[in-house]
Structure formats: C-alpha cells, structure tokens
C-alpha cells in the first residue's frame, strides 16, 4: 500500500516542479549572462590571445636576430598566425620609433641655429703672437728706417739672420707700415686742429709748454738745462727771477745778452739729443 501511494505521489510532485528545473546549470554561475556587454562585443578573450601572440612574435623575432641558424617550425607557424591587430601594433611601434629619431635629429640640428635661423659661424682661433726679443726688434726697426718693403731675397736674409720665419718677417713689416700710417694720420690731424685754433690758441699752447719747462727746471728734473719744449717764436723765454720791465711786462733782451746766449745753447743741446735718439749703422 505504501509503495503504491509513493508512486502516485511522485508524478504529482513532478507536475508541480517548474520547467526551469529541467534546464542545465550554467557553466559559470558567478558571471551573469550579458551577451550585449562591451567585453562580449569586443571579444576580449581573442584580444588577449592576440596580445599574447604579439608578445611571442616579438620574442621569436628577437631570437631570430641573435640566432640566425633558424627557428623551429612551431615558432614559424606561430609567427604566420599572428592577428592583424598584432601587425598593426608592430607597425605603430616602428612608426613611433622613426618619429622619435627624427625629432631627436631635428633638435640636434636646431642647437646649431640661432634665434633668427642663421647658423652660427665657428669662431676663428686666434694665432699666438710671436714674442720678439729686443735684439730682433732693434734689427727690424733699423732695417725699416730705410727700407719699408722687402724683396724676397732681403726677407730670406733677415729671417735667417734673426732666426725667424719668412711669415713672421712679413707680418712684422705689415704691422709696422700700418703703425706708421696711423702715426702720420694722427700728426696730420694735430696740425689741422692747431691751424683751426689760430694764433691765440698756439700762443696758449706755447705758454703751457714754457710753464712745464720752468717747473721741471725748478724741481731739478730739467736734465741739465736741455728742455724739449719749444719757445715762443720771436721772444726768448726768461728763466725764473729774470728782471722785468717797469710796466710789468717781460724785459726785451738784445741778441747779445747772456740770457739769449743761454737760450741758444739750450736749443743746441736739445737738437743734439734728438739727433742722438736714432743711430742707424748700415
């Protein structure tokens, strides 16, 4: 009796069960079924697989560079099965590497450019100046007094005599001619400025020169009475303490007076000194 009742009750329970109870359980019950999610649309598992294939392809390519003997067939098959995404990634990496190299080269090229786009001219290295000895300068100056331009034979002779090179002799004579030209231009400018001043300005200059001469003579630095300052033309200079005229002006001296004789001797002494400054022996 009990077995029959149980058999009758079992079909009734089966009727009361929901039809969902007969469905198989999902493979992953924790993950919800979302067929329209972003991951399902983009097929994320395949993307991960392509990334893994790309990494393997890069490793195999590096191994191919270091070991040219060849790769196994499995590795070459893996390289041939890379996805288009892997190829795109490799192409992008090569492109960016090329851009980085070009940017670095352009930056290095801009270092040599100025703000206005003009390339900096390299500074010329100055040659070291030749230090001439006193004997060499004396011999060169002595030769320059009567010969401003040298012939090749004279140049070789001077260079051999003084222990210099031909280039050093040529350079010294060029610089000396330029210095002489500057000195002549300065003297010419001084003469022109003196002419513009007029007689009064020239008289003032002569008076200042006489004052300097008298101060040197009183201080004991006159060099034995031989001064280099020029006297005023037409009126001999009077030493300190000379007698004056009653009106307060300087006393006019006769040509035969002792003061005029002293002035004439001082002029002769100055001329002798100027003649002795340059002594040239050919």
Swiss-Prot record:
Q: Report the protein's function.
A: Transcription factor required for the development of GABAergic interneurons in the dorsal horn of the spinal cord and migration and further development of hypaxial muscle precursor cells for limb muscles, diaphragm and hypoglossal cord.
- Chain intervals for the UniProt region annotation (Disordered): 1-36, 210-282
* Localisation per UniProt entry: Nucleus
Q: What is this protein's tissue specificity according to the annotation?
A: Expressed in the dorsal part of the spinal cord and hindbrain and in presumptive myogenic cells in lateral regions of differentiating somites.
Gene Ontology terms, MF aspect: DNA binding; DNA-binding transcription factor activity; DNA-binding transcription factor activity, RNA polymerase II-specific
Which Pfam families does this entry report, sorted A to Z? Homeodomain
The lineage is: Eukaryota, Metazoa, Chordata, Craniata, Vertebrata
**Under the cellular component aspect of Gene Ontology, which terms does the record hold?**
nucleus; transcription regulator complex
Residue ranges: DNA binding: 125-184
Q: Which UniProt keywords apply?
A: Developmental protein, Differentiation, DNA-binding, Homeobox, Myogenesis, Neurogenesis, Nucleus, Transcription, Transcription regulation
The residue ranges flagged as biased composition, category Acidic residues, are 269-282
Effect of knocking it out?
A: Death at birth. Mice fail to expand their lungs and do not move their abnormally thin limbs.
Write down the InterPro entries for this protein, in alphabetical order: HD (IPR001356), Homeobox_CS (IPR017970), Homeodomain-like_sf (IPR009057), HTH_motif (IPR000047), LBX_TF (IPR051892)
* Gene Ontology BP annotations: cell population proliferation; glutamatergic neuron differentiation; heart looping; muscle organ development; negative regulation of cell population proliferation; negative regulation of glutamatergic neuron differentiation; neuron fate commitment; neuron fate determination
> What is the protein name for this chain?
Transcription factor LBX1
Comp. bias intervals (Gly residues): 218-227
Q: List all disulphide bridges recorded for this chain.
A: none
Query: Organism, per UniProt?
Result: Mus musculus
């Amino acid at each position: 009796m009990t077995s029959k009742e149980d058999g009758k009750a079992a079909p009734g329970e089966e009727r009361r069960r929901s039809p969902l109870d007969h469905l198989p359980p999902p493979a992953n019950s924790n993950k919800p079924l979302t067929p329209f999610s972003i991951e399902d649309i983009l097929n994320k598992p395949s993307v991960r697989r392509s990334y893994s294939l790309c990494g393997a392809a890069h490793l195999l390519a590096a191994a191919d560079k270091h070991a040219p003997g060849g790769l196994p067939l499995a590795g070459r098959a893996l390289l041939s099965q890379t996805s288009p995404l892997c190829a795109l990634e490799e192409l992008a990496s090569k492109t960016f590497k090329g851009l980085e190299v070009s940017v670095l080269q352009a930056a290095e090229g801009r270092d040599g450019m100025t703000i206005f786009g003009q390339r900096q001219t390299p500074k010329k290295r100055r040659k070291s100046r030749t230090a001439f000895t006193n004997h060499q300068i004396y011999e060169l100056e002595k030769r320059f007094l009567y010969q401003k331009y040298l012939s090749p034979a004279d140049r070789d002779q001077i260079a051999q005599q003084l222990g210099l090179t031909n280039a050093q002799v040529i350079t010294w004579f060029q610089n000396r001619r330029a210095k002489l030209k500057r000195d002549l231009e300065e003297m010419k400018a001084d003469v022109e400025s003196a002419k513009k001043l007029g007689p009064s300005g020239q008289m003032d200059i002569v008076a200042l020169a006489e004052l300097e001469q008298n101060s040197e003579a009183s201080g004991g630095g006159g060099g034995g009475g031989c001064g280099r300052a020029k006297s005023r033309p037409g009126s001999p200079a009077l030493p300190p303490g000379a007698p004056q005229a009653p009106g307060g002006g300087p006393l006019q001296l006769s040509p035969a007076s002792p003061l005029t004789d002293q002035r004439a001797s001082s002029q002769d002494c100055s001329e002798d000194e100027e003649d002795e400054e340059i002594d040239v022996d050919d």
